[in-house]
Amino acid sequence: MTAVISHVTSIDPAARARPEVMAQFRRHSGSVLSGLFGAAAFDEVALVPVAAAVDKTGRFERNFTDRAIRSGFSALLAIWGDAEDRAAEGERLKRMHRDVHGHGKGDFADVRYSALNPRLWNWIAVSGMFVTLNSFTPVTGIKWNDAEREAAYQQLVEAFSALELPGKAGKFPATYIEAAEYYDQMVQTDLAANPFLDRVTAGLGKLPLPSALPAPVRAAAAPLWSVVSAGAGRVVKICSFGIMHPGVRELTGFRWQPHHDVEFNFYTQLLQMAWRVLPDRVVLVPLAYNRLQYEKLVKMHRSVALDSFAPPGGCPMG
């Protein structure tokens, strides 16, 4: 099974980040294939105040697919958007989360929460970054070294910098090593099994249709979706739980067995084949694809520029 958290205590000084690997990681951060690992972010609701908050709104539980799409689109904007768009998205999220505070309901009636509490906010951010990091090798088949993992983490920290809260407590872990230590500590001391985590884990057995689809499309797709959703949910569950921290997976009640390793390897081999043979237009989300096309065009435009505007052949007065 894929190792989720590498307990790296130092980076080999001889290790170097290979440019081709970093380019592949950047592509991966905009790939539709990584969506199959999205349920690894269930670690977010293993932090009970987060579970209380999302349980109170009901949106997560009503339609997990919608919630995943919204979160994914926001993250993609942070990674692939222009600087102005990234900053605007960060401010939008902070502004909208100001109203997310109070007491939970039902099983969480005694739980107080505030979305802008750095303890909750940073946990969700680090969770999202680790989903992208931990799904890289399963999707691409590329095995990276410690320096490359650190460079990839720094890419994500820079992309999500607009989400950091003010003050020292609002800063994300500065290095991958610190982030891994922080994650392990949260698993050991802060996370807990809870009814909401149980419900969303069980809900993977039948993924709902996205409500953003036009009503006629939803109506036409509903019969087929009712057949394929259980299978799709199974793939998402195995892929996601295959990269999930063992301590978090234990909290979900899901017991990983040897046959799950076989299933995980089968799915990831198919993903790696798709990664190798499918064109970017298919593998990447439109925002990432168009950004890369733009960068290629910029490079082409600059390739015809002169190195200098000085007269050729040296000084004419020489």
Residue ranges and their predicted role:
Residues M1-G318:
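Mature, function-bearing regions of proteins
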